[in-house]
């Protein structure tokens, strides 16, 4: 038992929740936000991971949600503002 309660099973639950939310959020993002759907989809996915981490008691999903949120916000900033293009390797 670790100090923060993150073990292998908990991290696997987070990866499964990441995989389950991935396809749905990209479909929603592509349907409603055609210009920068990838960044919006990652932000929606991060919010779903935050909610599901508390619902399924998964610290792994919470950690992955923070990582996905940081990537999503970085992509959104890179796509909407040319000063932040260095955040996305495809735009730099």
Curated annotation (Swiss-Prot):
Its primary localisation, in coarse terms, equals host cell
Q: Which UniProt keywords apply?
A: Host membrane, Membrane, Transmembrane, Transmembrane helix
Q: Name one GO cellular component term.
A: membrane
Give the UniProt subcellular location, in the record's own words.
Host membrane
- Per the UniProt entry, the disulfide pairs are none
Q: How does it sit in the membrane?
A: Multi-pass membrane protein
Identify the domain of life: Viruses
Question: Where in the sequence is the signal peptide annotated?
Answer: none
* Bilayer-spanning residue ranges: 11-28, 32-52, 54-74
Record's protein name:
Putative transmembrane protein ORF92
